[in-house]
Amino acid sequence: MDLLTWLSLREGIGHRDDAAAAGFSPVRVRAAIRTGGVQRIRARWIALPSAPVELKRAAAAGGALTCVSLARRRKWWVPPEADDALHVHLPGHESIREGGLRAHWAKPLGPTRPRSLEASVEDALAHAAECFELDQATAIWESAIRTEAITLDSLQQVKWRSTAARRVAEHTRNDTGSSLETISHVRLSGWGVRLRFQVHLAGHDVDFVIGTHLIVQVDGWAYHSSSADRTRDIAHDAELRLRGYTVFRFSSAQIMYDWPSVERILIAAISRGAHLAPFRA
């Protein structure tokens, strides 16, 4: 196997110590660098020109991808307004060497893989808890649960060091189907009114029930794949109203970008007793 093939099997980037262990002498590595087939990154990393930019930048920074940058790479949900900076987990002795980086210097939560360019899932989630508001951080955590081979129980057993991470761990669930549902759930919690999630009523599940009779439906990002879906939802809402429920349906845009209006409507409904069973004389 030649050096280029070896690198291609490692996502295009590798540490020179690993290359040496694989039988590639410093002379062969330097020759590959001279011909332009391999790039040198700092003193100890080498990469193909086609290697992922974020990995090359992490190597150049002397750290590992973390927080929202690892979330993007591993295809977790990312808040639409998240910054474009590269978030890197750096050892305590490293400093930022280029612009466009966001450094996280916290001590790793557990042992780290030698020369890894990706922080552990736990460290990345801890950093996300520090970088984002509770609702968005919780959505990132729950997306990681859906994407990675981790469980809610395992996350809740981690000895989180920051108050922010412990708070997110308390709010994280494993039964939400989307990040939009997660954000809605976090924002609706803590009002001092009973909140239930994914309740089966009148033949179909509803997203949230506040109290006993106030229903909140959240239409997702890809709302309605067909007119039949829309017709079914309208019919279900009508049946719920006939049974005495108050039903509000909000779009993803309202939840994400106009939450104060959503909150105002729901608080007004609660103040009028819409969350309580209707009085029947």
PLM-predicted stretches and their roles:
Residues 144-281:
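Surface segments flanking catalytic/ligand-binding clefts of nucleic-acid enzymes
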Residues 1-162, 168, 271-281:
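Short gly/ser-rich loop at a beta-strand->alpha-helix junction or flexible surface loop bordering the NTP-binding
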